[in-house]
Amino acid sequence: MAINLEDKKAIVAEVNEAAKVALSAVVVDARGVTVGAMTGLRKEAREAGVYVRVVRNTLLKRAVAGTSYEVLNDAFTGPTLIAFSNEHPGAAARLFKEFAKGQDKFEIKAASFEGKFLAANEIDVLASLPTRDEAIAKLMSVIQGATSKLARTLAAIRDQKEAAAA
């Protein structure tokens, strides 16, 4: 299906705006995925704050030009679906990693985070980044553990002094 020039410009502008505000990007080959599964993926992506779009490779190369996602240009081959994480850097990678478990033909090509190219086998690093809430919970447990250890130490010192005085 041919796209007129105005539509192409609009697509490039839309994807470029998404790329400018995104924290990370993941490129996949979604060939062979059913329409129902793709609809479900798009719904999950919206809920996770991930912008998902199927774009022609030439338009995609123009859209990411001048952004930190230019490093992905070599991955723009064949049918390409791109996802930009807007709220958490690992959101798109985590979403696609989970989705790929149930889809044989869904292939993660590459990702980019902070201007660095990540090959398909390095996606796990991005997907395993804790969310903001998870990071806060881990920090609080570390602080709580240190606080309780300090309290136990002070109590032991007090008990020793009381025993020595008695």
Curated annotation (Swiss-Prot):
It comes from the Bacteria. One of its GO terms (cellular component) is large ribosomal subunit. CDD domains: Ribosomal_L10 (cd05797). One of its GO terms (molecular function) is structural constituent of ribosome. Disulfide bonds: none annotated. Coiled coil: none annotated. SUPFAM superfamilies: Ribosomal protein L10-like. Keywords: Ribonucleoprotein, Ribosomal protein, RNA-binding, rRNA-binding. GO terms for biological process: translation. PANTHER family: 39S RIBOSOMAL PROTEIN L10, MITOCHONDRIAL. HAMAP family: Ribosomal_uL10. Belongs to the universal ribosomal protein uL10 family. Part of the ribosomal stalk of the 50S ribosomal subunit. The N-terminus interacts with L11 and the large rRNA to form the base of the stalk. The C-terminus forms an elongated spine to which L12 dimers bind in a sequential fashion forming a multimeric L10(L12)X complex. NCBIfam families: PRK00099.1-1 (NF000955). Forms part of the ribosomal stalk, playing a central role in the interaction of the ribosome with GTP-bound translation factors. This is Large ribosomal subunit protein uL10. The lineage of its organism: Bacteria, Pseudomonadati, Pseudomonadota, Gammaproteobacteria, Pseudomonadales.
